[in-house]
Amino acid sequence: MVTKMKKLFVLLTSTLLFACSSGPSLDQLAAQMPKDNRSVLLQVPEAGNPVSNGMLVATIRTAGGTSGKRLVSLLATDNLHIGIAGNSQSVNKAVAMYGLNNAEKVGKDVSLYLVGDSQSDKTDLEKAAKAKNVEMHYIMQK
């Protein structure tokens, strides 16, 4: 049990970036997530411009990248609330979809939080989450 907890601690601390806020979506996301020790934020970097972000999304869809693979690992953990935050909604969605589509094992009582402004993104993510028995919380950005 102690070994599992140590592994979980290492995984979570390597995943979390307690750095500066990435913008209003991080604040909004944190406000909507449960305030307990089962909540983690996965901060997703973006490329900096729309063309590069498009290339990054294509890469994430096929190979997952670091953030996608971290999400797959987090999804396997029981009793966890996972928030995905970053400056690009398309990159955030790509990471979430990669994680949901490629997670072979999903823990019990896992929920995913994401901020965005697209109804079609919300529908896609909810469908993928439901297939993996993950509770999806898509917060519509104002």
Report each predicted region and the residues it spans:
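Mature extracytoplasmic domains of secretory-pathway proteins
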Residues: S52-S111
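Bacterial signal peptide processing site
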Residues: S21-P24
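N-terminal secretory signal peptides that target proteins for export/translocation
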Residues: M1-K4
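Sec-dependent signal peptide recognition
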Residues: K6-L11
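C-terminal partner/receptor-binding element of secreted or periplasmic proteins
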Residues: V115-K142
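C-terminal motif of bacterial Sec signal peptides marking the signal peptidase cleavage site
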Residues: L16-A19
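Post-signal peptide N-terminal segment of mature Sec-exported envelope proteins
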Residues: Q28-N49
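Structural motif
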Residues: Q43-G48, G83-S90, L114-S118, M140-K142
